[in-house]
Amino acid sequence: IAHVGSNCQLEAMELARHAQEVEADAFAAMAPCFFKPSSVKDLVDFFTPIAQSAPDLPFYYYNMPSMTGVSLSVPSFLIEGKKTMPNLVGTKFTHNNLMEMGECLELNNGEFEVLHGYDEILHY
């Protein structure tokens, strides 16, 4: 999974196109941490052109509030984002809110993949 995240939307779009050109299996991006989106709509609006830059690859939202400072509803993002990003397949969920993670797993009968990214709470 190629990470294409950037505070610059145009740069992220270019990286997404490159990921598709080199036949990555998928791509992911974190929310911008400089000009932070303040709503799910803002987050969807930021990611839509990025996801559309590599329409043939699965796209994951890399949710990591501890690094980005963006803490918006991931289930709401997945539902709203799917409307404009057909290649949105899930999230890398790097947060300790297991209730929200469970909501993501159950959305639309398990439509979305949820990659667990918070290693500190995994048992060995």
Range-by-range predicted roles:
Residues P49-L57, M64-Y124:
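Catalytic alpha/beta core domains of metabolic enzymes, predominantly
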Residues I1-V70:
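Active-site beta->alpha loop and helix N-cap motifs at the rims of alpha/beta catalytic domains
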